[in-house]
UniProtKB/Swiss-Prot annotation:
Composition-biased stretches (Low complexity): 318-327
GO biological-process terms attached to the record: anthocyanin-containing compound biosynthetic process; cellular response to phosphate starvation; regulation of DNA-templated transcription; root development; root hair cell development
Gene deletion effect: No visible phenotype, probably due to redundancy with BHLH30.
Organism of origin: Arabidopsis thaliana
Name under which the protein is recorded: Transcription factor AIG1
GO CC annotation terms, alphabetical: nucleus
Amino acid sequence: MYAMKEEDCLQTFHNLQDYQDQFHLHHHPQILPWSSTSLPSFDPLHFPSNPTRYSDPVHYFNRRASSSSSSFDYNDGFVSPPPSMDHPQNHLRILSEALGPIMRRGSSFGFDGEIMGKLSAQEVMDAKALAASKSHSEAERRRRERINTHLAKLRSILPNTTKTDKASLLAEVIQHMKELKRQTSQITDTYQVPTECDDLTVDSSYNDEEGNLVIRASFCCQDRTDLMHDVINALKSLRLRTLKAEIATVGGRVKNILFLSREYDDEEDHDSYRRNFDGDDVEDYDEERMMNNRVSSIEEALKAVIEKCVHNNDESNDNNNLEKSSSGGIKRQRTSKMVNRCYN
């Protein structure tokens, strides 16, 4: 029995060395759990008299002929039957089972690269396809997460929503947007809201109770502290007085609607002005041309005010950029003191 065990172990050791030479494992001595040079000689006297289940990993490499191995009973629980070595995939599996965790840690020393070099082209293509499939699955998972995040934001924006599925939620969002658009249209028709672009409109509206012509001037521009001060000076230079004013400010934009009339110094100037407009005493006076001149004068004065707003805004942006570049930080924009003036 002992002689048979000794012969089997020696044969197994030679088989293991042949298998190592086949996979060039002699280039990686650090991954082996034992050293082939320091392997002690087999002593039958130290062999256990009461054999237990043989757990030495080298028993997996027993490649003796069937006549020799037939003397072992693989069903007695002492020795496991040797696996088939016919299929190439069994080589890697058998070696991994024999060497255990040490061989698995050996992948960092280049063993996996050596095995990958022995794979066929079809196996490499299959591995690449598997990696691409995993990458696509990960990208699809991130896309679904982004969509769910956006849907959660929409669900939180809606005032009263009980919808949970995506289709119903999107339909409710569309309906809510239509309602907001309708409300915005009503507000725009009722109240004058500033626009994002500068505009100016001057036209003659109607005659007041005294028969004086009232001119309606509407302009929209960037809001600034001295805007109304410039508007007042422009109107005074044209000897105009404001009958009514409507001012709306939203997001740094301002819209002014002014109803203007001629300002008189005395009663004689007032009568002369009315006669010129009515055309009673001055038959050759072209009333329409006079009105066009008056409207053009107001347009030029208010246009200069709007252009000053644009120029000041550009200078303010340049100064802010210069302060940021020089100090490396963001400084608070300087503002001039606002002057409130009232006029009749």
